Amino acid sequence: MAPLGDGAAAAAAAEPNLVVSFGEMLIDFVPDVAGVSLAESGGFVKAPGGAPANVACAISKLGGSSAFVGKFGDDEFGHMLVDILKKNGVNAEGCLFDEHARTALAFVTLKSNGEREFMFYRNPSADMLLTEAELNLDLIRRAKIFHYGSISLITEPCRSAHVAAMRAAKSAGILCSYDPNVRLPLWPSEDAARAGILSIWKEADFIKVSDDEVAFLTQGDANDEKNVLSLWFDGLKLLIVTDGEKGCRYFTKDFKGSVPGFSVNTVDTTGAGDAFVGSLLVNVAKDDSIFHNEEKLREALKFSNACGAICTTKKGAIPALPTVAVAQELISKAAN
């Protein structure tokens, strides 16, 4: 199970703004009609997904530099997903194939408002079997930002690989970005999910959570600032709470505020948070003074809100990720 050679190593080594994304990539099966159960769905659209991979693709589509570290089944779906990464401009040298496990699948139920529920087929799937010894630490240490979620924390050996990768990044002075991306059906219990997600909380420099995730993690009202600030810790540079179509809230040690969202025709919210994160990481990688400059941060968050909104207007995550031009067009229309 050697790393894939895709010829991107030299380019990544020379790229000062590389974002390395760690975790899972899978196939989402999205129903062709919203508002019905999985059993009632007449057909499904096959779409690549998995939050860390979506973030990597979002970064590349916006002109940034990204790489993905993770494991895939040595099956048609696995090879298809790695090809999709490459076609989207993502460095795939940190990807591995496992001949003994399948690529993960998820069936997505779309509610009439575009919100989702998930049913997963991944026990075990190849992404869960990545080991510490298989990590491409050279790639990780070349990054400016190391980004990850929490799904890779659920089971061994991937949990140990995740922690080792994160610590290698931190020891190299690389910024750590955390989007927990809570998926309760994958955890043994709600308590296990909460404990697992919070177990690495204070390793991050930047954390993005949704309002629903704030409510879950704090067991309180996400609109109550006291609950949000209970997630703050000394050393954190930026905490973002996304509030769906309402936009987002931001917190740093020096300032806080909110940035309104954009009104669009929402079809499927899959990948919206990943488009938001990817677009923000592109800007942080270019200029990390964003953490200390509120005007720059607000401009970046306006752009990220636009990217997240655009992603909800099509089914699937990666196919719906916007370009800079499309995001700027939405911002310009909203200003007029």
Curated annotation (Swiss-Prot):
May play an important role in maintaining the flux of carbon towards starch formation in endosperm. May also be involved in a sugar-sensing pathway. The gene is FRK2. GO terms for cellular component: cytosol. Strongly inhibited at high fructose concentration. Predominantly in roots and endosperms and low levels in mature leaves. Keywords: ATP-binding, Carbohydrate metabolism, Kinase, Nucleotide-binding, Transferase. It comes from Oryza sativa subsp. indica. One of its GO terms (biological process) is starch biosynthetic process. This is Fructokinase-2. Coiled coil: none annotated.
